[in-house]
């Protein structure tokens, strides 16, 4: 007389093996989906424009200890506080929030306590492993994570939140998540190493499509 128990145990073991194999395959596929894009080379450089209003001239500067390729932007005329900050190129917002702590520097209290890090900031993914970052914004960004933005769309206003000594826009371009020299209107900015204090002047061509 047979009870069927050995057969049942074998069936259960086979089912368990099938489930285990399926789980391993699913995990490998998930890893491949995540890792494969990371192995691709960066795409061509987008046609970045200055992240400020069309026709305005701004001073781009750096200083010792600032970090290579980081750019601080100051207007050459008028007040910096509250100036529109524009997307350098179309893309998707991946960060819109606070980096570090805000501090208390405002237009009404420009010498208030400094914060830490970048304060209010925005990061935009432009595809092809290219991204831009915009730091020390005056107030919460005007965009949200996941939002698609067009080149020239306003994403915030110039401020002095975070570790900032004066109102300005700290700006970066990254390729493959590594900082690179900023390009605007197809030309290198000239801001490279932070071995000394220096600046250049550029006029924005971040204008409405003609």
Task: Please give the residue ranges for each predicted region.
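Terminal targeting segments of Actinobacterial cell-envelope proteins
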Residues: 1-18
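Sec-dependent N-terminal signal peptides
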Residues: 17-27
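Acidic, glycine-rich catalytic/binding loops that coordinate metals and/or anionic ligands
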Residues: 44-49, 79, 111-114, 144-153, ...
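C-terminal region of N-terminal signal peptides and the immediate post-cleavage residues
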Residues: 30-47
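Zn2+-dependent peptidoglycan hydrolase active-site motif and core
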Residues: 87-139, 167
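Short histidine-centered loop motifs in beta-beta connectors
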Residues: 78, 86, 126-152, 176
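Short glycine/proline-centered loop/turn elements that form peptide/ligand docking sites
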Residues: 142-144, 154, 160-167
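A structural signal for short beta-strand/turn segments enriched in small hydrophobics and glycine
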Residues: 60, 91-93, 146-158
């Amino acid at each position: 007389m047979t009870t069927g128990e050995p057969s049942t145990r074998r069936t259960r073991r086979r089912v368990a093996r099938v489930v285990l194999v399926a789980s391993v395959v699913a995990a490998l596929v998930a890893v491949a989906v995540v890792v494969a894009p990371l192995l691709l080379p960066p795409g061509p450089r987008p046609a970045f424009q200055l992240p400020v209003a069309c026709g305005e001239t701004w001073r781009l500067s750096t200083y010792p200890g600032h970090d290579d390729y980081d750019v601080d932007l100051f207007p050459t005329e008028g007040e910096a506080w509250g100036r529109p900050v524009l997307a350098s190129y179309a893309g998707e917002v991946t960060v819109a929030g606070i980096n570090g702590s805000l501090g208390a520097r405002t237009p009404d209290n420009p010498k208030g306590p400094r914060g830490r890090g970048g304060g209010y900031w925005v990061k935009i993914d432009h595809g092809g492993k290219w991204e831009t970052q915009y730091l020390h914004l005056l107030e919460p960004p005007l965009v949200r994570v996941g939002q698609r933005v067009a080149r020239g769309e306003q994403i915030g206003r110039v401020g002095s939140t975070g570790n900032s000594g004066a109102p300005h826009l700290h700006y970066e371009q990254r390729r493959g998540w590594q900082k690179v020299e900023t390009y605007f209107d197809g030309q290198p900015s000239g801001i490279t190493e932070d071995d000394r204090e220096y600046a250049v002047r550029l006029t924005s061509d971040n204008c409405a499509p003609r």
